[in-house]
């Protein structure tokens, strides 16, 4: 779908469908009133019959109104005069998109300037959410269906904005398009089956991306290099699988050479059986989504490349497959990490932190401004925060605050959890420097505490996306593309874009 921005009178546009808001009690805003006058009062006459009350998301389709060049007019309820919240605004836009998808029109014009959204400016903020909602709603994953989805008739949507705000709406659409592109790539990777999407496949995806962008350098460390670097924890996770582990580095140079980079670290467990600490069979198919941290880093990088942000960014994807076999790691094994610290592996199903800890040590060599790791790390995070909010921890309050703010602005929220010293004691081991689990209490926090021991050399934050990376079961099952909006917003803010 192509999104364009124009500043013209709604009553004069030639289109298959013109979309106008109607407030509660059938109240028309300035734009809708002008269109109503051009149609000789046809819109207000229909409203007087009571066919549309104006509640948020309600729709009414009108055909062939006099005095207009639009073939159809779609009225959408915008509620009371008070500003809509983010959720209500997204629902309204999704409602409009649902109607438009059912029509044969190839284009539509949205004249929604009269709607206010709380805590969003009238141009960039409001239309950024609108554009992301429209574009993300276009996503379809039918690669393995013998019968593909029918191509949608709607190819172009024009957003009408006043002249004063046109440039800001265009900027919003530009950013939203890049974010939606990154989210779609993230969702594609997450939804792929694990027999195809393994560590070597992700490495090939990185190389293809590197070939397409001169500012991007790609390096892949194989299992021998991982072992030679002393990454004993990382290596241990993949040693039970026929698919060897890979540490994938993508280095984007968009800023000045002397600028310190931001580093994103993604957990890329392409399938997680739990290893010898085997998971229950029910729902195990969804463990293909255990690489969604790495997928979201990939997607964020795609957005950054599309926007050509003037920053330096290093993406590290820690990829492995966690399988049981005669060569797999056993509960009770002790490994030495790249940092020199030793870990007793008490549970092989707590493997994400093992690939991440060595990758966090590896990140030191880039002398980063900040390091953010993203991982589907703990089921405990789903218990604590559900599927709406990502968990967030870190060793620097400014960094954590910037990420929380980015989440609010991108409508991709996170919530901070503590890393108090008292929790560290739960990781004590009688045989090694630490265990890889901290017992049944505060599982998300103790996982963060574990990682914090390998991130002391820089400002660091950890995002647990176990509850937000995918939707389980049902017709909507699949990867969500989160937290690409949050991460991209954070980098947009750092770039001043």
UniProtKB/Swiss-Prot annotation:
Keywords linked to the UniProt accession: Aminopeptidase, Cytoplasm, Hydrolase, Manganese, Metal-binding, Protease
Necessary cofactors: Mn(2+)
Listed PROSITE patterns: CYTOSOL_AP (PS00631)
Substrates-to-products reaction catalysed: Release of an N-terminal amino acid, Xaa-|-Yaa-, in which Xaa is preferably Leu, but may be other amino acids including Pro although not Arg or Lys, and Yaa may be Pro. Amino acid amides and methyl esters are also readily hydrolyzed, but rates on arylamides are exceedingly low; Release of an N-terminal amino acid, preferentially leucine, but not glutamic or aspartic acids
Locations listed in the record: Cytoplasm
Coiled-coil region: none
Top class in the EC scheme: hydrolase
Residues forming the catalytic site: 279, 353
Residues annotated for Mn(2+) 2 binding in this entry: 267, 272, 290, 351
GO cellular component terms listed in the entry, alphabetical order: cytoplasm
Enzyme Commission number(s) of this protein: 3.4.11.1, 3.4.11.10
HAMAP family, sorted: Cytosol_peptidase_M17 (MF_00181)
Role description: Presumably involved in the processing and regular turnover of intracellular proteins. Catalyzes the removal of unsubstituted N-terminal amino acids from various peptides.
Stated name of the protein: Probable cytosol aminopeptidase
Primary gene name: pepA
